[in-house]
Curated annotation (Swiss-Prot):
Keyword set includes Magnesium: yes
Family: Belongs to the G-alpha family.
Protein's name in the database: Guanine nucleotide-binding protein alpha-2 subunit
Region entry G5 motif, spans: 524-529
Keywords, sorted A to Z: GTP-binding, Hydrolase, Lipoprotein, Magnesium, Metal-binding, Myristate, Nucleotide-binding, Palmitate, Transducer
Stored InterPro entries: Fungi_Gprotein_alpha, Gprotein_alpha_su, GproteinA_insert, P-loop_NTPase
Polar residues compositional bias, start-end: 67-85
Lipid-modified residues, N-myristoyl glycine kind: 2
Encoding gene (name): GPA2
Annotated region described as G4 motif, given as residue ranges: 467-474
Amino acid sequence: MGLCASKDSRESTHDGGPRVNRPGANDANRRNDVRKGAGDKKQDKKNKKAKGSIVNAASNINNSSSGKTKISTVSEDGTVSNGVGNTAEYDNANNKNNGNNNNSNNNDNNNNNNNNIGNNINGNNNNDSENIHDSNNSNIENKRYFNNINTGVLNGVNGNSTNSDKALSNQFDQSNNSETHSGTMTGISQALALNDSGVNGFDTDLAKRNGTVNASGGQSPGGSETVNALKVLLLGSGESGKSTVLQQLKILHQNGFSREELLEYKPFIFDNIIETGKDLAKARRTFNVQLEEDAEISESDLDELLSQQYQPTKLPCLPADLAKTLKILWNLQSTQDLLVSEHRSSFYLMDSASYFYENLDRISEPKYIPTITDVIRTRKKTSGIFDTMIDLDKNLKLHFFDVGGQRSERKKWIHCFDNVTLIIFCVSLSEYDQTLLEDNSQNRLEESLILFDSVVNSRWFARSSVVLFLNKIDIFAEKLRHVPLEKYFPDYTGGKDINKAAKYILWRFVQLNRANLNIYPHVTQATDTSNIKLVFAAIKETILENSLKDSGVL
């Protein structure tokens, strides 16, 4: 179920990004293939074999011998859209067209999609249309770039008025029910689900091959099938969004957070806010930013902020005087100017800083209880290994292992490496201009590339599939306007085009796949529950497809 690119196409030249294949083909045929005779099944299996697949973001595509591809994409209303299309390759460095794969229809679509980003990572042959587009030709100004999801919850890149964080927070806080996203994702489950017999058959077969059902394939005394969990590793460098993904799955599949669990995050939220204030004060000193004459705080206030050793775990609430100082500091024009200055890449500030400071009045209230969105936005360093069992449905259980991403934590991963079915590797797209906290001489994105290289080419993962989350696309889109990607990666030539930039980074990771593992890339925003719901619906389809292939059905 993957966009299966040959090794030659993956290593070709690029215009701001890698070569990939355009999606096409009718997904309904895949469902019908299951019902074909034995002879047809064998022929289908031959036509669909491919190594080193790069699987399209929210859809899963396979090359056939004829150069066509199969795709099932999710449309805006939550249904699966089908179609047949030619395999497309990326343009080369001179933006030359590949005439064999271009036709007038493709050119029309490419012209319409020139500024589109959707849930599919695709390459177009038109020299002006290197982009990541969705199946509905959504415009980047009006639609979120990574999904075909209703804009009732999600904002456009250029600042639509809807506040998605507030909307999600209100929905979850009022109902604690992940299914009520103002109609968002309606029909996704139905669209992506097979009939009961297909799902049951798949899960039994997959579980048997992985030793996850009893030897006879029997059922538990209660009549339900005994299915253990498939092992899934959440890997990636520090602050790439691994733990946030796990939090979203808890919201979607474990009824969210109890009041007690929400309260456990208070000290971490307080710590995030206080440390952000200290980071800002340090940055102002480093770059000699003077306070305004009419500022309501003084340098001595900043001295006190930097010298105080706060213990968030012992704070029942955020002290009023501290909250006032932090709010004034954040709202200073000189501070806001610093955040968009040429110095921004030279100092650390957590991704959710603006979110917490915009909500500082609420958070500093004496009876403050964190919201779901507060929890998702919280930076909480993972130390050691944490495991969580997630039921994607009644017959598919995933055992997630979340491990620390900092260098000091990586040596602990070895204990999780046996019998791994799936690796979810998280990359923060927005970290291209940042350095490691533990080594300020090492670029974070380069570090992620090194780590990804060691993972995909490790003998431990020779039989594993890799899901690549290109995360924090929202922050990446905003940062790209002000911080040139080519400043840190000189071989990138796509300028401020977010489509080319995202594909370039994907290309850098794909080039490291010497072991020819199947790679399934997804453009994600881990803080967005609806986005993660869609992505994991696609991942469920990926597991299903792989199971059917392994069993010889496809």
